[in-house]
Each structure stands twice: as structure tokens, then as C-alpha cells.
From Swiss-Prot:
Membrane-spanning parts: 20-40, 78-98, 107-127, 173-193, 194-214
Assigned protein family: Belongs to the ATPase A chain family.
Species whose genome carries this gene: Prosthecochloris aestuarii (strain DSM 271 / SK 413)
Gene3D superfamilies linked to this entry: ATP synthase, F0 complex, subunit A (1.20.120.220)
Biological processes, Gene Ontology terms: proton motive force-driven plasma membrane ATP synthesis
PANTHER family the UniProt entry points to: ATP SYNTHASE SUBUNIT A, CHLOROPLASTIC
The protein, known as: ATP synthase subunit a 1
Subunit and partners: F-type ATPases have 2 components, CF(1) - the catalytic core - and CF(0) - the membrane proton channel. CF(1) has five subunits: alpha(3), beta(3), gamma(1), delta(1), epsilon(1). CF(0) has four main subunits: a, b, b' and c.
Molecular function per GO: proton-transporting ATP synthase activity, rotational mechanism
GO cellular component term, pick one: plasma membrane
Protein's UniProt keywords contain Ion transport: yes
Free-text function comment from the UniProt entry: Key component of the proton channel; it plays a direct role in the translocation of protons across the membrane.
Keyword vocabulary terms for this entry: ATP synthesis, Cell inner membrane, Cell membrane, CF(0), Hydrogen ion transport, Ion transport, Membrane, Transmembrane, Transmembrane helix, Transport
Amino acid sequence: MHLSGDDVIVWQYGVVKLNQTIVMTWVIMVFLAGGSAFLTRRLSSGIRISRWQSFLEMIVTMAMQQIREIGLRQPEKYLSYLATLFLFVATAVLFTIIPGYEPPTGSLSTTAALALSVFVAVPLYGIERVGFGAYLKSYMKPTFIMLPFNIISEFSRTLALAVRLFGNMMSGVMIIGILLGIAPLFFPVLMSVLGLLTGMVQAYIFSMLATVYIAAATKSRDE
């Protein structure tokens, strides 16, 4: 059992290698894109809507309400990005029920890429909200001496996001691998269920931390 899909080479041409992590990342992205298109193909803007559309709207409303409670006044502007983060991590976890599947989130390269997207999104949303000059000045609050510390803080929390998600996902894979050698039937099933629950919690925490960072960039920086 491999701890990471990085170790499994699916295709290679010279120095160019395509590992399982990259393949499964694209599989998840295609699955989410195709699933979204399929589930929303019959949505209506009219008065009469289906029960399915009513259910989807209820979920979207709940998500926007939670985003608003964190501090983002216009949650619809951020919902697509934050929901994509959650759905990607959650889907990567749910696919672990497939035999032989290794979640791409068990690779530091994937979690680093997700954290990097948050690192880029935070200043973009902040600049869009308060302007380029005001956003840059926020790094010198309450005094210009804080500039290097605020910059270090931006990088350190990005690293923390990547390592936190990677550590939790990798630990689940390692525990299941160990228990497979002890009790090939009972323990892996139990740990798989617990792993799914833990993974969903991690997906939620990751997206909520991204929401908090964006809220800090668009709210507190403008005060």
C-alpha cells in the first residue's frame, strides 16, 4: 500500500512523469464539472420549481448564511470559490471507498496547491473590496514596524493550511494501512468510516479557514 499517489507512476515519457495524484486530481475535477452540469441542467428561474431545485436552493441558502455570519456581506461573490474548495476535498475523501484509490489530498503537492489558491484569492478579494493602495497599507497597521511580521503571517498561515490538511489525510491512510496488516476485515472497515467522517470535517475546516482569511482581508482591513 502506497502512502501517496506520488509514488505510483501511471505514464512516463523521458523525464516527464504522470503520477496517480495528478490523474486522480483531474478525475475529481472532471467528476465535479460533469456532476454540476448534470445536476443543474433542469433548473428553472420561474415560480414553479422542482423539489430537487428547492433542495439545492436550500443548501445554497444555508451556505451563504454561514459565509455571511463569518463576516462576508456579499456571500454570493465568494460562494463559488469556497464551495469548490469544500467539494474538491470532500469528493477526494468520499472516493476512498473505491478499492485501490489513493486520495490526492494525501499528497503535500495537492494540499500545497489548494493552500496556494487561498493565498492568491485572499489579496485578490481584499484588493477588489478596498482597493490596491488601502490593502497594501493594511500591512503597516497599527504601525509600519508590523510590515514584515504581517507578510510572514501571510506565508505561515498558507503553510499551516497545506500541512494541516496533508497531515490529517496522510494519517488516515497510514492508520488504515497498519490495521490492514493486523485485522484485514474488521478494522479497515471501521477506520474507513471514521476516515470519511474525519475527511469531511477537514474539508469543512479548510473551506471555513479560507472564508475567515477572506473576511479578514475584505472587512478588518477596511476599518
